[in-house]
A protein has these predicted regions:
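C-terminal accessory extensions appended to soluble enzyme cores
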Residues: 2-11, 212-266
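Conserved C-terminal portion of the radical SAM core fold
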Residues: 129-196, 221-237
Length: 266
């Protein structure tokens, strides 16, 4: 099915309510998506949970398009599912109940990496605490609605393929029973100057991209680990074909997953 774009509505910016032409209030055009990704640009569950719940009460939010910089109102009038991206959703746990009051549901893409020794992810809780949070989120929303995301996969002067597999194996052994799905992505440095600048700023010049042979070596090792876990593994945004290792091409946000998990929501 070809995507035909978002539904559009007219809303009152003071109240967030959808109105029809002829209303005395000044109206603005808004998109009204069924699925809202919140958000790849920042960690809303970790940092802006209270703000998000307040916007949910207001019924809309404004979004700055990364393509042309336009400010676009987004109405929640049609929204059925929120997809949250987070490295630390623990602060958001008390707010989860608010999402279901109006029949809305949630999926989580929980980025759970282990680059502790390299200090690549400052400001997040220790790995053990994040693993406990992963288990708690799973108990609240269900394992089918919680995706483990290991992103980015990288190698460096201190991180070898074997090191990476050992770290992933340790995490997977602890959380596989709390999820059904693992999404991976390999670091892409050459294509993104911003990534190059950030790595240089942190003094992390030894980090590099995988060679094709290293990708296959890693995929083989991950496939062996998954014999114990039984997870669906997808490579998000990758050109290389890893299906021979049981790693499918896929999207980070899976419409099949959404349809499966919310099949009763018509």
């Amino acid at each position: 099915m070809k995507w035909k774009g978002w539904d559009r509505v007219r809303l009152d910016p003071e109240t967030g309510a959808v109105r029809f032409q002829g209303s005395p209030a000044p109206l603005v055009d808004a998109i009204a998506p069924i699925i809202v990704s919140a958000s790849r640009s920042t960690d809303i569950p970790a940092l802006y949970g209270d703000w998000f719940i307040e916007r949910l009460k207001q019924g809309y939010v404004t979004w700055k398009s990364p393509f042309d910089g336009r400010i676009i109102p987004v109405s929640f009038v049609n929204t059925r599912v929120f997809v949250f991206w987070s490295k630390n959703p623990r602060p958001f746990i008390p707010s989860l109940a608010n999402l279901t009051k109006d029949g809305r549901q949630s999926l989580f893409l929980f980025t759970l990496n282990d680059y502790t020794r390299e200090d690549l992810e400052p400001g997040i809780p220790p790995l053990g605490e994040r693993i406990r949070t992963f288990a708690e989120i799973s108990s609240l929303i269900g394992r089918g609605r919680l995706t483990w995301r290991f992103d980015p996969l990288l190698v460096s002067d201190t991180v070898t393929i074997d090191d990476l597999l050992e770290r992933i194996g340790s995490i997977g052994d602890q959380i596989a029973r709390f999820t059904e799905r693992l999404v991976i992505s390999f670091i892409d440095i050459a294509r993104y100057p911003r990534v190059q600048r950030n790595l240089a700023k942190c003094g992390l010049s030894g980090i590099r991209e995988f060679s094709s042979e290293e990708i296959r070596l890693f995929a083989s090792g991950l496939s062996q680990l998954n014999e114990e876990w039984g997870l669906e593994i997808l490579a998000c945004g990758e050109e290389i074909d890893l299906t021979g290792y049981g790693i499918a091409h896929g999207e980070c946000i899976s419409l099949d997953q959404i349809a499966r998990e919310f099949s009763s929501d018509q």
